[in-house]
């Protein structure tokens, strides 16, 4: 199975799927903000940044998927982004499921001074909502619960792809081939 996953990771389609899915989810978030009028909170902004990290990872490997170092960089960036997104989503979910006056998220994003994304791209990274509010649901799951599911899937898939890159598999001996 690992050999098959390694072969898949050398195909452009896998990395296109990663880049496209994260871009589609980012576009959906922007539609929720500007089309439906839902206000993003600070944690939503951080989750968007993690999704953009996944898009960048997919784009890096899409350039030349057969080059091992590019695949490794893309997998590392994608795994880092998906794990950070999952951890932020868990924190966000905790704020929504267990609201308390002492558990609040900040109002201004805490980006490094050298990368003030909320000032450079305010149409994407400017938070205007509260983290405690659940504004949308689908099939009984809130948007944050869906993000936990999505980031979990990304973590599992990218972890398996990374393991397939570093573990050597034995070639199967075939009788008639």
Swiss-Prot record:
GO biological process, one term: protein folding
Keywords noted in UniProt: Cell inner membrane, Cell membrane, Chaperone, Disulfide bond, Electron transport, Membrane, Oxidoreductase, Redox-active center, Transmembrane, Transmembrane helix, Transport
Disulphide connectivity of cysteines: 41-44, 105-131
Top-level taxon of the source organism: Bacteria
Periplasmic side of membrane: 32-49, 91-145
Record membrane topology: Multi-pass membrane protein
Pfam families: DsbB
Compartments it resides in: Cell inner membrane
A single GO cellular-component term on record: plasma membrane
Ranges in the topological domain labelled Cytoplasmic: 1-14, 66-72, 165-177
Chain segments annotated as transmembrane: 15-31, 50-65, 73-90, 146-164
UniProt keyword DNA damage, yes or no: no
Sample GO molecular function, one term: electron transfer activity
InterPro entries: DiS_bond_form_DsbB/BdbC (IPR003752), Disulphide_bond_form_DsbB (IPR022920), DsbB (IPR050183), DsbB-like_sf (IPR023380)
HAMAP family assigned: DsbB
Job description of the protein: Required for disulfide bond formation in some periplasmic proteins. Acts by oxidizing the DsbA protein.
Alphabetized NCBIfam families for the sequence: PRK01749.1
The family this protein is said to belong to: Belongs to the DsbB family.
Listed name of the protein: Disulfide bond formation protein B
Source organism per UniProt: Haemophilus influenzae (strain ATCC 51907 / DSM 11121 / KW20 / Rd)
């Amino acid at each position: 199975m690992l050999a098959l996953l390694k072969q898949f990771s050398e195909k452009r389609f896998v990395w296109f799927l990663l880049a496209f899915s994260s871009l589609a989810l980012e576009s959906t978030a922007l539609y929720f903000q500007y089309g439906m009028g839902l206000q993003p909170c600070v944690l939503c902004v951080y989750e968007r940044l993690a999704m953009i990290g996944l898009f960048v990872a997919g784009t890096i490997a899409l350039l030349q998927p057969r080059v091992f170092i590019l695949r490794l960089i893309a997998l590392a960036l994608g795994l880092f982004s998906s794990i950070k997104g999952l951890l932020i989503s868990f924190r966000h979910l905790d704020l929504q499921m267990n609201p308390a006056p002492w558990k609040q998220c900040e109002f201004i994003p805490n980006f490094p001074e050298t990368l003030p994304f909320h000032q450079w791209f305010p149409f994407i990274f400017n938070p205007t909502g509260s983290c405690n509010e659940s504004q949308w649901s689908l099939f009984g799951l809130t948007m944050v619960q869906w993000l936990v599911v999505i980031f979990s899937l990304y973590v599992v898939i990218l972890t398996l792809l990374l393991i397939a890159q570093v573990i050597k598999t034995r070639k199967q001996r075939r009788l008639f081939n």
